[in-house]
């Protein structure tokens, strides 16, 4: 990416010039669906998913190279005792991913999904958002650019996930800054915060948003001031996927916060995205509703790691398989609707 003016300038340009869906591929998918051996609409959302795949890939619905991308980052705000786990767990879980021992590894095996994990300077936590910006504009833009590389190896379905102790606090701050209400509306237990710890978490979100209140009219400023490296990288990955016409499945509360930044910058920025699941984190459903989306799954999960998006990838693969593999009425010798 070229450097022109301020670090965010290139991203602002990209967000203004997003490609739209492929109307011809969408029409072809609808035409084929009408000929398949089933009543119209009988596959419900599977049909809509197939149409979504066609519209954004520009071809018949297919998922041949699905990929889960996990972005890991650490946060200075954890020093306020807002989470029961130490920041060292982020690095330990990255190592667990590499060893194949995490839940996401098992889901990827079960659904034949690729997996990439991006370690985002874990030894250098972001700034404490209650006292300063999480990132400089230059660092935030560089991390977005790094996130865009998630698709470099090729994929036709990108599942976005994260790992980062303290990042549900970050997600809550972003949602509070974007949508208002109260900090308590957006803060949940995360990895298990309760009692006094939960109150400290709420207080941290309140203090952070108040500190940066003069800069909340710009979504990219919200991201750099209240976000984190995994937030910036996920936003970059989602943006890169749009440019390359790759459909995206977004995971939980934290990944949705990254997506919300893009939506605030351009209302059409998430048209190529579906929400994989609604997590048990209380603010997630509210955040999804603010995006105008409907999650594919509701399993009471709150793990992160891209697990909900990865499970939803199995549904997307099934939708594509039904669309491409089912016989038409003519092929099967089945009578159509009179």
UniProtKB/Swiss-Prot annotation:
Enzyme class per UniProt: transferase
HAMAP family hit by this protein: CobT
Pathway annotation: Nucleoside biosynthesis; alpha-ribazole biosynthesis; alpha-ribazole from 5,6-dimethylbenzimidazole: step 1/2
Any one GO biological process: cobalamin biosynthetic process
SUPFAM superfamilies recorded: Nicotinate mononucleotide:5,6-dimethylbenzimidazole phosphoribosyltransferase (CobT)
Protein EC: 2.4.2.21
Residues of the active site: 305
The family this protein is said to belong to: Belongs to the CobT family.
Record keywords, A-Z: Cobalamin biosynthesis, Glycosyltransferase, Transferase
Described function: Catalyzes the synthesis of alpha-ribazole-5'-phosphate from nicotinate mononucleotide (NAMN) and 5,6-dimethylbenzimidazole (DMB).
Gene: cobT
Name of the protein: Nicotinate-nucleotide--dimethylbenzimidazole phosphoribosyltransferase
Lineage of the species this protein comes from: Bacteria, Pseudomonadati, Pseudomonadota, Alphaproteobacteria, Hyphomicrobiales
Reaction it catalyzes: 5,6-dimethylbenzimidazole + nicotinate beta-D-ribonucleotide = alpha-ribazole 5'-phosphate + nicotinate + H(+)
One matching Pfam family: DBI_PRT
InterPro entries noted in UniProt: Nict_dMeBzImd_PRibTrfase (IPR003200), Nict_dMeBzImd_PRibTrfase_bact (IPR017846), Nict_dMeBzImd_PRibTrfase_N (IPR023195), Nict_dMeBzImd_PRibTrfase_sf (IPR036087)
Signal peptide region: none
């Amino acid at each position: 990416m070229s450097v022109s003016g301020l670090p965010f300038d290139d991203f602002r340009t990209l967000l203004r010039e997003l490609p739209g869906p492929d109307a011809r591929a969408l029409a072809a998918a609808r035409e084929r669906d009408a000929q398949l051996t089933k009543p119209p609409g009988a596959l419900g959302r599977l049909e809509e998913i197939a149409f979504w795949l066609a519209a954004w890939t520009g071809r018949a619905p297919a998922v041949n190279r699905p990929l889960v991308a996990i972005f890991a980052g650490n946060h200075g705000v954890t020093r306020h005792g807002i989470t029961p786990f130490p920041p060292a767990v982020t690095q330990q879980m990255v190592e667990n991913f590499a060893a194949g021992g995490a839940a996401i590894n098992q889901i990827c095996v079960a659904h034949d999904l690729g997996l990439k994990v991006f370690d985002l300077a874990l030894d250098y936590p972001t700034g404490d958002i209650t006292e300063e910006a999480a990132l400089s504009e230059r660092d935030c833009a560089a991390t977005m650019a790094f996130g865009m590389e998630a698709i470099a190896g090729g994929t036709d379905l990108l599942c976005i996930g994260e790992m980062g102790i303290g990042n549900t606090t970050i997600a809550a701050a972003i949602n509070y800054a974007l949508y208002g209400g109260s900090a308590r509306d957006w803060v949940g237990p995360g990895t298990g915060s309760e009692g006094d710890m939960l109150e400290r978490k709420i207080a941290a979100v309140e203090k952070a948003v108040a500190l940066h209140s003069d800069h909340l009219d710009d979504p990219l400023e919200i991201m750099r001031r209240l976000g984190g490296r995994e937030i910036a990288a996920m936003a970059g990955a989602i943006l890169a996927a749009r440019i390359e016409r790759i459909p995206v499945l977004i995971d939980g509360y934290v990944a949705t916060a990254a997506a919300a930044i893009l939506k605030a910058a351009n209302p059409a920025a998430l048209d190529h995205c579906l929400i994989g699941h609604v997590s048990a984190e209380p603010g997630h459903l509210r955040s999804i509703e603010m995006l105008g989306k409907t999650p594919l799954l509701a399993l009471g999960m709150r793990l992160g790691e891209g697990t909900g998006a990865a499970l939803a990838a199995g549904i997307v693969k099934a939708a594509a398989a039904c669309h491409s593999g089912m016989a038409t009425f003519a092929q099967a010798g089945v009578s159509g609707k009179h």
